[in-house]
C-alpha cells in the first residue's frame, strides 16, 4: 500500500476511534523496539465526537477479574455454547442471559467489526448536578471588572437549570458570598495574609455543623440536589438563584483597599483558591464541578504569593529561574501543588482565565490546571473579544443540548501480553493502579495503567506510551497473523447526569523476525512528531533547555541512521522514504518553537503554550509545531499553500499565517502601499478589493471552532507586528547568506539561527557517519 493510501487509512481510523499510533506494526522483541528510536505510542482522544455512533443503553459485558476487558469485535464468540473468549487474557466467559437471541446474522452492536469504539450509558447516576464556582479578582480596572461581571451574568443562561453556582471574590481579603441569604448581601471574609487549613475553612463557613455531615441522599439525575447540605447556602441551582446571583454580580465593586503609586494591589489569590477548594471538598467530593478563576494580576499577599507588593521588585523571568534567583517561586509552587493534589483527589476542575499584560503566576499555578484537565486562557484584557468568545465556548452544547464537557473521568489501558504501558503525557494524575499491563520503564506519568482526568472534553487528547514485553529468544510457533492489542476504557460523568463508558479497542500486527520493511512502512511521521514533542516538553519542565534540544537532535540522527538509505560516509547518497521525509522538518521547527525556546517569552506564556500542546490532537499539534502559511496574489485565485520560509515573502503577495495561537495576515510591501493609497475603494479595482478580503474570510473559518480563541493580527511588511511571522519562518535568506545561487529573493531575516537547508546538511552528514 502506498503512503497516500496509508495516510487515508490512518485518518479514517482517527475519525472512527480518535487514535493515531507512531508505529502501526509492532516489533516482536524489546531489542527490535529499542532500535526504532521513536517509542511505540498513541495519541488518543477519548471523547472524539462521532455523531453517527449509537449510545448503548445497557451495561457492558466484561471479562472476569482481574482482567475486566470489555466485549469487543476482536473477541471469539461461540454462539452455540453461549460463551466468548477474551482476546486479552484468553479466559472463557459466559454470555449474559439477554444475549440469548443472538445468531450469526443478528449480533449486538459491540461485536460489529466497525464497533472498535463504542459508548455505554451506565445505570449509575452522578451524585450531584454540575457545579460552577466563580472566583473573581476585584483588584482590576473598572472596565475589566465590568467585562468579567457581564460575561458571568451572560453565562448563567448557558448553564443547565439544575447546575449549582457559587461566587468567591478576592482582593486584599477573600469573600465567600452566601447566595442563599436573600435579606441583604452577606459574605464570609477570610484574611488574605493567613494560610487556612481545610478544617479552619470548613469551621468558619459553618460546614461542620453537627448532623449536617451525613452523606447526601441519592437523587434522580437531572433534578437539583436537595438543599440539605450545609454548602447549599453558598452553591445554589441556577433556576432558583438566578436573580440573587445576578444581583450580587452587578453590585460587585473594585477592591476598596488603597494602592500607592509605587505598589501593586494586595491580591490573595492563594487564599481564594484554598477557600474555594475547601468549600467544594466538604459537600461535593467526587461530584463534577469547576472552580473558574478570573485574575488580572499576580498574587502579592498570603500563601502562594509570586511577587512582592513593591513595583520595583520585578516578577521572575526565565533568566531568574535558570540562575536560581527566585525568592518566592519554590514556596509558591509547593503551595499550589498541594492544592492541586487535593482538588484532583476530589474530582474537581480548575480553570484559569487571565486578563493581564503582566504575568500573574501561571507558572506556579499550572499544577492546578494540568492535573485536573482544566482550561488556561491567557489574554491581554478581559475587555478583549479573545476572552469573551473563549469563555462562551467553554459552555458549548451538543446536538442533544447537553454541555460538551465531561467530569470526573478515569482512563484505564489494558494490553495483551506482547505490550506493556509505560506512561501517559497529558492533563491527568496517576491512580496508581498496578496490573499485568504495566511496564518496567516509565515515560511521563508511569507505573500505573489508570489515570484520573477531572475534566475532559471532545478535544482532550493524551499521549500514551508502550514497550514490548518480549525480551527476545526463540520465537514461539505462530498460527496465522499475530496481533497485539490494547483497550482504552474511559469512564466519565456526562453533563446529562449519568455516567458513561467509552471503549476503544485497537489491534495491530506484530512484525515477523525479519519484518524491517513492514515496520518502516507503518511509521506515521505526524503522530510520531507529536508524541516526541510531548516527551520533549515533559523533559523541558524538569531539565535544562540545551539538554532537551540535544536529546531531540540525538533521537533524530539515530532515526535517520536507522531508516534512511545511504552509503556510509557519503551524505549525497542520503534518501528517506516518503513516510519519513517530513519528520526532520517537524523536528527542525519543534526545536525553534516557543515550546523549547524560551527566549522572548515569559514563564507564564511558556506554561500556557505547553499546556495547550498537551491538550490537542495530532492535526492541531502539528500546526503549533510547524505553522501553515498560505499566499494570495493577483496571479492566482484563492489561497496557495507556500513553504514556511523567508523566500515566501514577496512584495505583491498577502500571507496568512496560522500558528494555532496567532492568526496573522501579512501584506507585502506593494500590497500595503496600494491599500494605503485606497485603491480598494476606487472603481475598477474589484480584484484588489477581493484579494484583501479573501484572507480575512479564511481567517474567520480558522477561528470558528478553535479554543482558546487565537490572537488575530493584521500587519504590513516592515511593521512591528510582522515579527510574529518572521520568527516562525525558516531563515533561508539571512543577512549573512543571501539567497540560494547568490540572488536575493524574499525578505532578509536578521538571525543567527541555521536554515532548514543547513540543518538537513548537518543531519545527513551525522546520520551517514554512524555517530550519534
From Swiss-Prot:
Main subcellular location: cytoplasm
GO cellular component, one term: endoplasmic reticulum exit site
Gene Ontology biological process terms, A to Z: COPII-coated vesicle cargo loading; intracellular protein transport
Topology of the protein relative to the lipid bilayer: Peripheral membrane protein
Record carries keyword Magnesium: no
Protein name, per record: Protein transport protein SEC23
GO MF annotations in UniProt: GTPase activator activity; zinc ion binding
Gene that this sequence comes from: SEC23
Organism in which the protein naturally occurs: Coccidioides immitis (strain RS)
Domain of life: Eukaryota
InterPro entries: ADF-H/Gelsolin-like_dom_sf, Gelsolin-like_dom, Gelsolin-like_dom_sf, Sec23, Sec23/24_helical_dom, Sec23/24_helical_dom_sf, Sec23/24_trunk_dom, Sec23_24_beta_S
CDD domains attached to this UniProt entry: Sec23-like, Sec23_C
Residue numbers binding Zn(2+): 63, 67, 86, 89
Places the protein is found: Cytoplasm; Cytoplasmic vesicle, COPII-coated vesicle membrane; Endoplasmic reticulum membrane; Golgi apparatus membrane
Keyword list, A-Z: Cytoplasm, Cytoplasmic vesicle, Endoplasmic reticulum, ER-Golgi transport, Golgi apparatus, Membrane, Metal-binding, Protein transport, Transport, Zinc
Biological role stated in the UniProt entry: Component of the coat protein complex II (COPII) which promotes the formation of transport vesicles from the endoplasmic reticulum (ER). The coat has two main functions, the physical deformation of the endoplasmic reticulum membrane into vesicles and the selection of cargo molecules.
Pfam families: Gelsolin (PF00626), Sec23_BS (PF08033), Sec23_helical (PF04815), Sec23_trunk (PF04811), zf-Sec23_Sec24 (PF04810)
Amino acid at each position: 500500500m502506498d503512503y497516500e493510501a496509508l495516510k487515508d487509512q490512518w485518518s479514517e481510523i482517527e475519525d472512527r476511534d480518535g487514535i493515531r499510533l507512531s508505529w502501526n506494526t509492532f516489533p516482536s522483541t524489546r531489542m527490535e523496539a529499542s532500535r526504532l528510536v521513536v517509542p511505540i505510542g498513541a495519541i488518543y482522544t477519548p471523547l472524539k465526537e462521532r455523531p453517527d455512533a449509537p449510545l448503548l443503553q445497557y451495561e457492558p459485558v466484561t471479562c472476569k477479574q482481574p482482567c475486566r476487558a470489555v466485549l469487543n469485535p476482536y473477541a471469539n464468540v461461540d454462539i452455540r455454547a453461549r460463551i466468548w473468549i477474551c482476546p486479552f487474557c484468553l479466559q472463557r466467559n459466559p454470555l449474559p442471559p439477554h444475549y440469548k437471541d443472538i445468531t450469526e446474522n443478528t449480533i449486538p452492536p459491540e461485536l460489529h467489526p466497525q464497533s472498535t469504539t463504542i459508548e455505554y450509558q451506565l445505570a449509575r447516576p452522578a451524585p450531584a448536578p454540575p457545579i460552577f464556582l466563580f472566583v473573581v479578582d476585584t483588584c482590576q480596572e473598572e472596565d475589566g471588572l465590568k467585562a468579567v461581571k457581564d460575561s458571568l451574568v451572560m453565562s448563567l443562561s448557558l448553564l443547565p437549570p439544575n447546575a449549582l453556582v457559587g461566587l468567591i471574590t478576592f482582593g486584599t481579603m477573600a469573600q465567600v458570598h452566601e447566595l442563599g441569604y436573600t435579606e441583604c448581601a452577606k459574605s464570609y471574609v477570610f484574611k488574605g495574609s493567613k494560610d487556612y487549613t481545610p478544617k479552619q475553612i470548613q469551621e468558619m463557613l459553618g460546614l461542620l455543623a453537627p448532623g449536617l455531615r451525613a452523606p447526601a441522599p441519592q437523587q434522580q439525575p437531572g433534578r437539583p440536589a436537595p438543599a440539605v447540605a450545609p454548602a447549599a447556602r453558598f452553591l445554589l441551582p441556577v433556576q432558583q438563584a438566578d436573580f440573587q446571583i445576578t444581583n450580587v454580580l452587578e453590585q460587585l465593586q473594585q477592591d476598596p483597599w488603597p494602592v500607592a503609586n509605587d505598589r501593586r494591589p494586595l491580591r490573595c489569590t492563594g487564599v481564594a483558591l484554598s477557600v474555594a477548594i475547601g468549600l467544594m471538598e466538604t459537600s461535593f467530593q467526587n461530584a463534577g464541578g469547576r472552580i473558574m478563576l478570573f485574575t488580572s494580576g499576580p498574587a502579592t499577599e498570603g500563601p502562594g504569593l509570586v511577587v512582592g507588593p513593591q513595583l520595583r521588585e520585578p516578577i521572575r523571568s526565565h533568566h531568574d529561574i535558570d540562575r536560581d534567583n527566585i525568592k518566592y517561586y519554590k514556596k509558591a509552587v509547593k503551595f499550589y501543588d498541594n492544592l492541586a493534589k487535593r482538588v484532583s483527589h476530589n474530582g474537581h476542575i480548575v480553570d484559569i482565565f487571565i486578563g493581564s499584560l503582566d504575568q500573574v503566576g501561571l507558572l506556579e499555578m499550572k499544577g492546578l490546571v494540568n492535573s485536573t484537565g482544566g482550561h488556561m486562557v491567557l489574554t491581554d484584557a478581559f475587555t478583549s473579544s479573545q476572552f469573551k468568545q473563549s469563555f462562551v465556548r467553554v459552555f458549548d452544547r451538543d446536538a442533544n443540548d447537553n454541555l460538551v464537557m465531561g467530569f470526573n473521568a478515569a482512563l484505564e489501558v489494558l494490553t495483551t501480553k506482547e505490550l506493556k504501558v509505560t506512561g501517559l503525557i497529558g492533563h491527568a494524575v496517576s491512580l496508581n493502579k498496578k496490573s499485568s499491563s504495566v511496564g518496567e520503564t516509565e515515560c511521563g506519568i508511569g507505573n500505573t495503567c489508570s489515570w484520573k482526568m477531572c475534566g475532559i472534553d471532545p478535544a482532550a487528547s493524551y499521549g500514551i506510551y508502550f514497550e514490548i514485553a518480549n525480551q527476545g529468544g526463540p520465537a514461539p510457533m505462530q498460527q496465522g497473523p499475530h496481533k497485539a492489542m490494547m483497550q482504552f476504557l474511559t469512564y466519565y460523568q456526562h453533563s446529562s447526569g449519568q455516567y458513561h463508558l467509552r471503549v476503544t479497542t485497537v489491534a495491530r500486527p506484530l512484525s515477523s523476525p525479519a519484518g524491517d520493511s513492514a515496520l518502516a512502512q507503518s511509521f506515521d511521521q505526524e503522530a510520531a512528531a507529536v508524541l516526541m514533542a510531548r516527551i520533549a516538553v515533559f523533559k523541558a519542565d524538569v531539565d535544562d533547555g540545551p539538554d532537551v534540544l540535544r536529546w531531540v537532535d540525538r533521537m533524530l540522527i539515530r532515526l535517520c541512521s536507522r531508516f534512511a538509505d545511504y552509503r556510509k560516509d557519503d551524505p549525497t547518497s542520503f534518501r528517506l522514504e516518503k513516510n519519513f521525509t517530513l519528520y526532520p522538518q517537524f523536528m527542525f521547527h519543534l526545536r525553534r518553537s516557543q515550546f523549547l525556546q524560551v527566549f522572548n517569552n515569559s514563564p507564564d506564556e511558556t506554561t500556557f503554550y505547553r499546556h495547550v500542546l498537551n491538550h490537542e490532537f495530532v492535526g492541531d499539534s502539528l500546526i503549533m509545531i510547524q505553522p501553515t502559511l498560505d499566499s494570495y496574489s493577483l496571479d492566482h485565485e484563492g489561497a496557495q499553500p507556500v513553504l514556511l520560509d523567508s523566500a515566501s515573502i514577496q512584495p505583491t503577495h498577502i500571507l496568512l499565517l496560522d500558528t494555532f495561537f496567532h492568526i496573522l495576515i501579512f501584506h507585502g510591501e506593494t500590497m500595503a502601499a496600494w491599500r494605503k493609497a485606497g485603491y480598494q475603494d476606487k472603481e475598477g479595482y474589484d480584484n484588489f478589493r477581493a484579494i484583501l478580503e479573501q484572507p480575512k474570510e479564511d481567517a474567520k473559518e480558522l477561528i470558528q471552532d478553535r479554543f482558546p480563541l487565537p490572537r488575530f493580527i493584521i500587519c504590513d511588511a516592515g511593521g512591528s507586528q510582522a515579527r510574529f511571522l518572521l520568527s516562525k519562518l525558516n531563515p533561508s535568506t539571512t543577512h549573512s547568506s543571501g539567497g540560494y545561487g547568490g540572488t536575493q529573493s524574499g525578505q532578509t531575516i536578521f538571525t543567527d539561527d541555521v536554515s532548514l537547508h543547513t540543518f538537513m546538511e548537518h543531519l545527513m552528514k551525522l546520520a551517514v557517519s554512524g555517530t550519534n
